[in-house]
Amino acid sequence: MAGPQDASLEEILWRSPPHVQMMGGYLHSNNILFYFAESPFFDATSNNASLAIQANYNEAFRHFVETREAFEGRLRTMQGLEFVVAYDPLQAAAQTDTQFAHEPSNVWVIRKQMRRKRAGQEDEVVVLATFFVVGDCIYMAPSVASVVGNRILSAVTSLTSLLKTASTLPIFTPAHGHTYLPPAPKPADAGQPGVPSQQSKENTPMPDAENPARVPLVGSQAGNTASTFQDTRTLAESLHLFLRYEDEYMDENPLVGEPGSFIMSKANDVDRTATAKQPQSTIPTKMGAPLVRVDTPGKGPEKVGTPSSSDESSLKKKKGGVGG
């Protein structure tokens, strides 16, 4: 299991140009392990460090550090922690001793492994870590658990950000349920027969002109539009309910009077008040026939049709004129 120190080593890069200059100016097969020993990835308790110290103080071990083959051959006879070269680009590209089949990649692979000796059997080797040397830069290869963990963390972070953004979009209304955008009202004259469907061409946008109405509403714009629509809808419903139930009261004895002098009315008073408020009957009655006055003879002093004295004198004058 990788500890806290191993986790931090996966995030660093180490290089040392001065050590490269001290080792001849470039890295090759015989000095790559000694260059790696100067990095923080190296373990001072490994067999590599023990063999290098013995070669410095014992002439009998000096030849083990002259070539990498001899050095790794000596490590295979020891038991414990060791660092070996798993991939050598120079050997992989070499065709003969003096020619290369292709250009070397200059990428080295070094493994940290634990070797255990078993009697009569091959050694048991357990790989603990892998390192890459690219040019003079040394990296530690991440473990599979670290790679998978980082990918899962990245996916979870993206999903969390998505849910935070999407949580502000749904709108709930009793009429429409859960919606992400407010329903667009239908035009009033869209389905009416007889209404011309031709529209004015004055405001027709040109093909190369941007139409701001086609820009989608996102984020706060969609929220503001939905809030305005909901407020307008609530106001219309409230006005409709008021006009429908304005004469109904929840109390058995409603308040009557003017503001500042309200009194509790009784049920009988309410009935009388309601009866008084009812308009009088305005049902038209049948019109009778016109009255005709008929004069009948009676005892009155007045005589109907009696000529006056002036009329009699005028008649006499006419008769006299005719006779003469």
From Swiss-Prot:
Organism whose genome encodes this protein: Aspergillus fumigatus (strain ATCC MYA-4609 / CBS 101355 / FGSC A1100 / Af293) (Neosartorya fumigata)
GO biological process, one term: regulation of transcription by RNA polymerase II
UniProt keyword list: Activator, Nucleus, Transcription, Transcription regulation
Listed InterPro entries: Mediator_Med6, Mediator_Med6_fun, Mediator_Med6_sf
A single GO molecular function term of this UniProt record: transcription coactivator activity
Quaternary context: Component of the Mediator complex.
Compartments where found: Nucleus
Ranges of biased composition (kind: Polar residues): 221-230, 275-284
Positions of region (Disordered): 178-230, 271-324
Gene name per UniProt: med6
Pfam families hit by this protein: Med6
Protein task: Component of the Mediator complex, a coactivator involved in the regulated transcription of nearly all RNA polymerase II-dependent genes. Mediator functions as a bridge to convey information from gene-specific regulatory proteins to the basal RNA polymerase II transcription machinery. Mediator is recruited to promoters by direct interactions with regulatory proteins and serves as a scaffold for the assembly of a functional preinitiation complex with RNA polymerase II and the general transcription factors.
A GO cellular-component term linked to this record: mediator complex
UniProt similarity note: Belongs to the Mediator complex subunit 6 family.
Domain of life the protein comes from: Eukaryota
Protein name, entry field: Mediator of RNA polymerase II transcription subunit 6
Signal peptide coordinates: none
